[in-house]
Amino acid sequence: DYETEKLSFNGRECNLNPDPAQIRNDISCLVSYLSSLNSFYGDVQQAQRDYYAFMNWYFASLFMPYLRYMANKNSYEVTLFPVVGIIYGESNGGKSTFLRMLSKLMCNAKIPLNATSDFSASNIEKLRCGCEGVPLNIDDLDKDQFRNHSGRIIKDDVWGIAEHFIN
């Protein structure tokens, strides 16, 4: 709740002033994960930069609906605040593990990854409304499923604005 400066998840109020030891533990997890990419092949430094950029978007994504609403209200471009993030890469590259870690760090809960069949305009609409701004994580998205539905999902620049959907 932006006005009362309180955050709740599944009806439970979250502590917005976490214990410094927990913060250090979370940072240690992130550093350990990003360092583990050193054993991968290819452009490791670019992969680390990409994962770091995605991580920052992921944590900020909770605020994107509100930022989009305020941008629209004040005649700014809503596409500056994307509500869709995509990680693409080779199989067994650690993407699913990365998403599980991010959702655990963000919500202090294990949030299941969605199936490729959830990636359709109608399913995504229902999931978005129910997830209160928490990112949807679709695991191993099938290329045909992506090709058939991505345009309507990714290019939906006005989603949630008219409904004042701000989490």
Q: What spans do the regions from the language model cover?
A:
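Extended, charged/polar low-complexity intrinsically disordered regions
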Residues: D1-Q48, P65
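Hydrophobic core segments within long, regular secondary-structure runs in both alpha-
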Residues: I27-V31, M55, W159, E163
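Conserved NTP-binding/hydrolysis core of motor NTPases
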Residues: Y66-N167
